[in-house]
Every structure is written in structure tokens, then in C-alpha cells.
């Protein structure tokens, strides 16, 4: 019991997973663009990855984003998070993402393209697909995001056992 108290007070080194680095991100996006799957699925997956990476979003934050939480501004996009693990008092928080010079890796451009192609105008922006490429009304789960990221890492040839979602 005393040791646990000391550990909590002093802290201990975490043996966490590695973060995805920019070179991995580019590999993943390049591979997604080459994939032989429906355009709408490619665009959803690349948007999840670019928004997640660009804004440092947790999986649960990504899947909680609704259309009503998005505000496109001249500089990029503001995304309101109603709840977050880091928002201890439940006040909500706004994350801003700027436009990137290179559109291919720009989370804002990808988000705009996703919303246009998916025709989402309300509710969750990251939804599940039914058989084929039919978008459902159901929000993705955080586990779905894990599977999408791991699959993309695998296809990109990046060893995925050392990575985990935020």
C-alpha cells in the first residue's frame, strides 16, 4: 500500500507505445490514396487520420465530433469538443486546425472534401458503412478507429504492434 502511494506521488516511467511520426503519416496517406476501395471509404479513413494527427485528438474525441461542432474559418477549422479526458470540469474545449500548404496532407481540406462527398449535414461526422459503401447513421466506435489505423499502418508497411491510438 505504501509503495503504491509512493508510486502515485513520485510517478513512474510509462512503457507506452510510439507515436505516429510525420513520415509514417505521409506513408499512410499515400497508401490510402492508392487503395483499391471506394472513394468514400478512402476519404473517411484519410480524414480520420489527418484530423486525429493534426489536432492531437484522442480516439474518443474523434468519434464524438458532430457536424454542429465544426466551424470553418478563414485560417482553417475550429472543432468544439463537448467532453474530453483532459477537460476535467466538462466545460468543453475548442481545437483549431490551420490549412496546410500541401493540400494532400491538409486535415482541413480533407474534412471539407469528406463532408461534401458524404453529404453529412448533421450529427456524427465519422460514421460506419453498411455492406459496400453505404454510409449509415451510426457513429464509429473508438475500436473502429483503432482497426482503421492499424489496417492503414499494415497496408503502408509500417509495423503496427508498436503503435496505439491516443
Where do the PLM segments sit?
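Extended, non-catalytic subsegments within catalytic or DNA/protein-binding/adaptor domains
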Residues: 1-166
Amino acid at each position: 500500500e505504501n509503495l503504491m502511494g509512493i508510486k502515485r506521488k513520485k510517478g513512474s516511467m510509462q512503457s507506452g507505445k510510439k507515436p505516429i511520426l510525420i513520415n509514417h503519416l505521409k506513408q499512410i496517406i499515400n497508401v490510402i490514396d492508392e487503395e483499391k476501395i471506394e472513394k468514400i471509404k478512402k476519404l473517411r479513413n484519410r480524414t480520420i487520420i489527418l484530423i486525429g494527427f493534426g489536432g492531437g485528438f484522442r480516439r474518443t474525441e474523434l468519434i464524438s465530433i458532430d457536424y454542429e461542432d465544426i466551424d470553418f474559418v478563414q485560417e482553417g477549422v475550429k472543432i468544439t469538443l463537448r467532453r474530453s479526458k483532459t477537460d476535467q470540469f466538462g466545460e468543453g474545449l475548442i481545437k483549431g486546425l490551420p490549412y496546410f500548404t500541401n493540400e494532400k496532407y491538409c486535415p482541413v481540406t480533407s474534412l471539407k472534401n469528406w463532408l461534401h462527398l458524404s453529404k453529412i449535414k448533421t450529427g456524427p461526422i465519422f460514421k460506419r458503412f453498411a455492406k459496400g459503401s453505404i454510409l449509415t447513421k451510426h457513429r464509429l466506435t473508438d475500436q473502429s478507429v483503432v482497426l482503421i489505423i492499424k489496417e492503414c499502418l499494415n497496408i503502408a508497411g509500417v509495423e503496427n504492434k508498436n503503435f496505439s491510438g491516443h
